[in-house]
């Protein structure tokens, strides 16, 4: 279904503006957000600038290097693997469609417009999808969501009141570990007391044995 929706957007952008508005209005009326089931949203991803996301080729190479076996497996691994499979297939079909349109449109301006639309607009959406799911598999969903919220707060804060550098995703797990370590002594406070209470018993038993 997702592939059908993406191809419909491209096909409706060619004939007339009216047909394009009808198709896009029908799709937008469904209020489909591919990130909702993962705790994120299109709006949350939009805080990241377009040049933040690697190229599709780099993202595909990363996904293939890290998760090729799982992606090619007939088994259901996780929702992120399934979403990655769909995004990769959608991009392949979009490339085939752009190639076909580019070869069959006689008007060079229209041909360039369609190819540019696929590469820029749809390309950005696919880059966002690939980055999100690869990052969730690599760093964990909670870490990625924490990063998106942190970056959203940072980018919306006036420059005079925010750190000079934006948050970095790869450093968030280290920060999370530090926070967990900082909280752990509070949970483990009873353990030293138990050890202390047990030590006199051992000493008493040893003294009794020595007396016997």
UniProtKB/Swiss-Prot annotation:
Bias type Basic residues, positions: 178-205
Record bears the keyword DNA repair: no
One Pfam family here: Hepatitis_core
InterPro entries associated with the record: Hepatitis_B_virus_capsid_N, Hepatitis_core, Viral_capsid_core_dom_sf_HBV
Residue ranges annotated as propeptide in the record: 184-212
Residues covered by region (3 X 8 AA repeats of S-P-R-R-R-R-S-Q): 184-206
Sequence repeats: 184-190, 191-198, 199-206
PTM description: Phosphorylated.
Protein's UniProt keywords contain Secreted: yes
Signal peptide: 1-19
Keywords associated with the record: Disulfide bond, Host nucleus, Host-virus interaction, Repeat, Secreted, Signal, Viral immunoevasion
Positions of the record's site feature: Cleavage: 183-184
Gene Ontology MF terms: DNA binding; RNA binding; structural molecule activity
Cellular localization per UniProt: Secreted; Host nucleus
Cellular component aspect of the GO annotation: extracellular region; host cell; host cell cytoplasm; host cell nucleus; T=4 icosahedral viral capsid
Main subcellular location of this protein, as a coarse class: secreted
Family indicated by similarity: Belongs to the orthohepadnavirus precore antigen family.
Function as written in the Swiss-Prot or TrEMBL entry: May regulate immune response to the intracellular capsid in acting as a T-cell tolerogen, by having an immunoregulatory effect which prevents destruction of infected cells by cytotoxic T-cells. This immune regulation may predispose to chronicity during perinatal infections and prevent severe liver injury during adult infections.
Protein name from the UniProt record: External core antigen
Lineage: Viruses, Riboviria, Pararnavirae, Artverviricota, Revtraviricetes
